[in-house]
């Protein structure tokens, strides 16, 4: 009988936070679907204060995930709870949650949109969220709501702005 | 004199308080009836009794005030009146100050304002207590600057098994056994594994900001505080962040992060009826079922009671140390809640969710189970069978199927 919490030993080696920031671990992985979805790449990548990222392509398709900074803080993911396909979710509403050895952490919708696809790979392999949070560890693919322009959505930040908030976190 | 006393009692200054006496007495009668709390709060009650019970001095003050129409022939009835009055006064002080239960609006005000405080729930309803915790957590303002709004809650639940948000309940508990021993089943809003509660277990919940949150922080404080109180307790932290005593687990923790805030809540086994716990945290038909699921599996641990300290002492000590350690400016107040007075629509909604079949039985992770003696493999998502070797089972509720498993073969 299975009785042990599954662990994926994929935790980052201890790296100083300063190095992490400078190395921009929170930038989108250019070799994975959230970036490669359209040939020209995403038009915009934005970040929330709750450590979600959103990558928006020209056809208004967007990918959402959580940042490297967040997954490092959460520790090894043991379960990823995602919304049902077809659900319309408003900005700030819960998009799901990630349970790690340390906590169940809520994920919030960065901008209004409808869920088109969820990353089903995470059902069996939640550790991918830790391994590649800015690429293969994407959570939800969605269609942005009519007239939503992430560059004008209040509360969304550029990578640079986001990483500045991390300095203030300490 | 009796006239004077009743006038005095009906004067505008006291009339409100007398109503309060009756209200709170009524609430207390109800709660006591419901949970047999008399003994439970005896320590704290007697502490305030010593502090506030009017002494003979109070009686003499009353007699002085009553001198103008003092009548020796009525002494005995007057003394009866005085003692009745003193009893009221005592009840007022005892309940009014020591355990003034917050109204819905008082609760809302303190939760939504910034600041640190302690809440002790006097309810033993697990649904109310988890909903209250959820309400305080959701409505605590994020502190962007300055000290964060640390909050500490205590609650004691009647018998129940509480599973983590992302657990497969069928794999964690035996519903039939729970029912036969009068344990409620709840799915909580936080992650982690399954725990059992009864009146000998105190739950504490420490709320802080996401930035300040660190899983082991509060348990380290508790260990320090309790060991300094009594070194014989020998409490320690294990690598998972749970509190242990002599290698046995006495406390289990779960954590939630949302909305820029986080909480760590945990159980503390003080004098729980552990005999009643045995066999409850096993799936039904363990030898016949083979489970496979994503989601979170409980880690089985040997448990014991702390002994030495009672639930009331634990709450009193941890509250007092919290008040000292976390004080920033001004005292950290202690508030009391119960499900009759300190309730609002948001708390009721969360209670409804926690009580709903939908949340208990039709959420949680996907799983599959192999029933060996029937040669069946059943796949379940959100409580419904979606795949099986036998077509006629597809679309059935797994709960109903398991309850009547023999009729399906």
Swiss-Prot record, chain A:
Subunit structure: Component of the glycine decarboxylase complex (GDC), which is composed of four proteins: P, T, L and H.
Function field: The glycine cleavage system (glycine decarboxylase complex) catalyzes the degradation of glycine. The H protein shuttles the methylamine group of glycine from the P protein to the T protein.
Domain Lipoyl-binding: 61-143
Keywords annotated in UniProt: Lipoyl, Mitochondrion, Transit peptide
UniProt xrefs under PANTHER family: GLYCINE CLEAVAGE SYSTEM H PROTEIN (PTHR11715), GLYCINE CLEAVAGE SYSTEM H PROTEIN-RELATED (PTHR11715:SF3)
GO molecular function, one term: lipoic acid binding
Gene Ontology terms: biological process: glycine catabolic process; glycine decarboxylation via glycine cleavage system; one-carbon metabolic process
N6-lipoyllysine modifications at: 102
Protein name in the entry: Glycine cleavage system H protein, mitochondrial
Record keyword Transit peptide present: yes
UniProt key word Transit peptide: yes
UniProt-listed InterPro entries: 2-oxoA_DH_lipoyl-BS, Biotin_lipoyl, GCV_H, GCV_H/Fam206, GCV_H_sub, Single_hybrid_motif
Record SUPFAM superfamilies: Single hybrid motif
Induction, per UniProt: Induced by glycine and repressed by the C1 metabolic end products.
UniProt family annotation: Belongs to the GcvH family.
Native species: Saccharomyces cerevisiae (strain ATCC 204508 / S288c) (Baker's yeast)
Additional remark text: Present with 3510 molecules/cell in log phase SD medium.
From Swiss-Prot, chain B:
Single Gene Ontology BP annotation: protein modification process
InterPro entries: aa-tRNA-synth_II/BPL/LPL, BPL_LPL_catalytic, LipoylTrfase_LipoateP_Ligase
Pathway recorded for this protein: Protein modification; protein lipoylation via exogenous pathway; protein N(6)-(lipoyl)lysine from lipoate: step 1/2; Protein modification; protein lipoylation via exogenous pathway; protein N(6)-(lipoyl)lysine from lipoate: step 2/2
Enzyme class, spelled out: ligase
Binding residue positions for ATP: 188, 193-196, 249
Highest taxon in the source lineage: Eukaryota
Pfam families, sorted: LplA-B_cat
Keywords: ATP-binding, Ligase, Nucleotide-binding
Residue ranges of domain BPL/LPL catalytic in the record: 146-330
Reaction equation(s) it catalyzes: L-lysyl-[lipoyl-carrier protein] + (R)-lipoate + ATP = N(6)-[(R)-lipoyl]-L-lysyl-[lipoyl-carrier protein] + AMP + diphosphate + H(+)
Additional information: In the transfer reaction, the free carboxyl group of lipoic acid is attached via an amide linkage to the epsilon-amino group of a specific lysine residue of lipoyl domains of lipoate-dependent enzymes.
Protein function: Catalyzes both the ATP-dependent activation of exogenously supplied lipoate to lipoyl-AMP and the transfer of the activated lipoyl onto the lipoyl domains of lipoate-dependent enzymes.
Family of this protein: Belongs to the LplA family.
Name of this protein: Putative lipoate-protein ligase A
Organism: Saccharomyces cerevisiae (strain RM11-1a)
